[in-house]
Amino acid sequence: MKLLVLGVNHETAPVDIREKVSFSPAQVQNALSELKSQGLANESVILSTCNRTEIYTTLKSQSPEKIRAWLHEYFELEEDSINSFLYEYADIEAIKHMMRVSSGLNSLVLGEPQILGQIKEAFHLAHKSDSVHQTLHALFQYIFKTAKQVRTDTAIGSSPVSVAFSAVALSKQFFGKLENQTALLLGAGETVELVARHLKESHIGNLIIANRTLSKAHQLTESLGGYAISLHEIDDHLHEADIVIASTASPTPILKTEMVANALKKRRNKPMFMIDIAVPRDIEPAIGNFSDTYLYTVDDLQEIIEENKRSRKDAALEAEEIVELQAENFMAQYQATQQISPIIQRYRQQAYTLKEHALQDALHHLENGGDPQELLTKLANQLTNKILHTPTTNLHHAGLNGQKEVIQAAEQILLTQQSDASDSSENENTHATS
């Protein structure tokens, strides 16, 4: 077996190259089928996101170059045109890479959790397409376990590193829980949408979205809750807001000092927490001079983000140690399995051969008028004696020669509790016929 990872990502290829080898879900199924039907891979999983395309395969005799050639042919690219952007890992280095990817250590945003879900989707799609068998199934379960350990045992995902997430995190630090707070969001672009989603996940009490184009604000509130207003209506609703987060494309400030002064009077000087993540700014800087306003800018958030990035980098060093250990553990288990598998197959074949001989003998006597009950009893006794003959003879010799380790191993292997044996009988039958 040779495990191979072949791919491109945001570090090795620009977007115009990545999009050339990006698989849609329908293409993934077709590509998996091709890899199998053309004899290029025993097993395969394809991961395709905006930042990476990776092919995970197990090979017997095919060389990685044939997978490269197939990739060029599949996307109708000129021969070797993207080779300089491709990376390749084999065996234990492939395992380490897959563990790093699933743990977010190889992501554009260090430690981001979305990649694990994307890998799980890729695995399930390949499994559904009958492209995953024993080796990749075992490996991916180990990879999922490792990714979970990285997130549990390190702080890789605990510190926000996006502006939207940091804005909400800062709001939670200020208020604690957000269930009783009202948030006013200025704008309806991608950043505001992310802020709104994070606020909803944090159980914000009420949500108001103000935007120049009212229909865009309505689209967000329809999916996320709250209500929409136009920018002209802000003055009528500003006093309701405990939290104001602004991110419009306005060339001049939206919130004026006088507007906030009036809102504070209506609030009876109840504090307002404001974050201006727009450039140019949406909130007049002088508003931060009020004793009851707490105004942060995108630069303040950037300091938090940079500090959190440093924290994640420290956690990444711990995560690398986990990856190294778990990759070695999986490889050791796999190699041990590979050593024992031929022995199991030979033992099963011996038992199957004994069964066939005994069965044919019984059928012959049955056709010649033998008593069925006597023949069944004889068949059962023959199979029992023949199957037990070799192990019991060898065990007897081990006793005569004082081989205590062999005796202990035999006791553990042969004297299985009946409940365990019955529980595993279905698996035994499945393996015997596979």
UniProtKB/Swiss-Prot annotation:
GO biological process, one term: protoporphyrinogen IX biosynthetic process from glutamate
NADP listed as a keyword: yes
Key word NADP present: yes
EC number: 1.2.1.70
Keyword terms of this UniProt record: NADP, Oxidoreductase, Porphyrin biosynthesis
Catalytic activity: (S)-4-amino-5-oxopentanoate + tRNA(Glu) + NADP(+) = L-glutamyl-tRNA(Glu) + NADPH + H(+)
A Pfam family per the record: GlutR_N
Annotated residues for binding of NADP(+): 187-192
Disulfide bonds: none
Subunit structure: Homodimer.
Additional remarks: During catalysis, the active site Cys acts as a nucleophile attacking the alpha-carbonyl group of tRNA-bound glutamate with the formation of a thioester intermediate between enzyme and glutamate, and the concomitant release of tRNA(Glu). The thioester intermediate is finally reduced by direct hydride transfer from NADPH, to form the product GSA.
General function of this protein: Catalyzes the NADPH-dependent reduction of glutamyl-tRNA(Glu) to glutamate 1-semialdehyde (GSA).
Record-given protein name: Glutamyl-tRNA reductase
Organism (species): Hydrogenovibrio crunogenus (strain DSM 25203 / XCL-2)
Classification lineage: Bacteria, Pseudomonadati, Pseudomonadota, Gammaproteobacteria, Thiotrichales
Underlying gene: hemA
